Amino acid sequence: LSMFGQDLNCVVTVNAEKVTQTDPKIFKTLETSIFEFMNTRKWSDDIFKPEERIECQILITITEELSSDKFKAQASVVSRRPVYGSDYNSTLLNFVDKDFEFNYAEYQPLEYNDNQYTSNLTAMLAYYAYMIIGLDYDSFAQKGGDKYFLKAQTIVNQASNSDSKGWKSFDGTRNRYWYVTNILDPKFAGIRDAIYQYHRQGLDQMYNDQTKPITIVTKALQTLDNTNRTSPNSMFVQLFFSAKSDELLGLYSKATPAEKSKAVSYLT
């Protein structure tokens, strides 16, 4: 399912092929409910024109039935932003959340309150809505996503008292807790500046002249490399490169040998 909504244009798919005991109709109802939750709710304070709404997709794959209304799943979350002067969309987030466990009964309303943890499903969906908006805003203005990352962090803090996985530091090294914690950690501030430089000063300027923008992209990669050396294997850096790997190959295919050499030194 997809449509234009308030802030997000989110395609939602629920894949329940592995589930045999539950009526498949329940998962179509769930898909519709999530679609409406993501697309019709007002997540930001800004007014979006239809063509400005943030492109994203959530693919939820049900892996196990724990009971008649409790399911274990994983969710693939992807978001993109347009590149000025082109019809190309650049990926900002590409993450598979392997701890997407939730309760759902058919036609159960998806209730959510910013100030209170009501269910793991709506907490996870709201978390990703705010992360998607925060990343988008960071790509258009320096640290422009602060407000939305703080909202995502509030959800993490509220959900950490639940017994659901992915909200706590000891649940693993690649989860919801660590992603927003990395983003708001001052030692990773350079990465957020690099995201702005990469997109707004790099990609968005390439319609006019590729020479200067590609040097800015290379400087952004240098910042990421420096951060990775001081804080190796951080989730923030890993997710940046998982989103950008194919794009970087395309960008540097037309770069000068010297620029390619610099980029390779930062990427290896």
Task: Label each PLM-derived region with a short phrase.
Residues D69-N182:
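Acidic/His-rich structured neighborhood in mature extracellular/periplasmic domains
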Residues L1-G5:
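Gram-negative bacterial Sec-dependent N-terminal signal peptides
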Residues Q158-L224:
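Alpha-helical segments in soluble extracytoplasmic regions
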Residues E17-P24, E111-S119, R229-T230:
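Second-shell loop/turn segments in exported
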Residues F35-W43, G134-D138, L249, S253:
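Sec-exported extracytoplasmic/periplasmic mature domains
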Residues Q6-K72, V83-G85:
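Start-of-domain marker
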Residues T13, Y196, R200-T268:
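A cross-kingdom marker for long, charged
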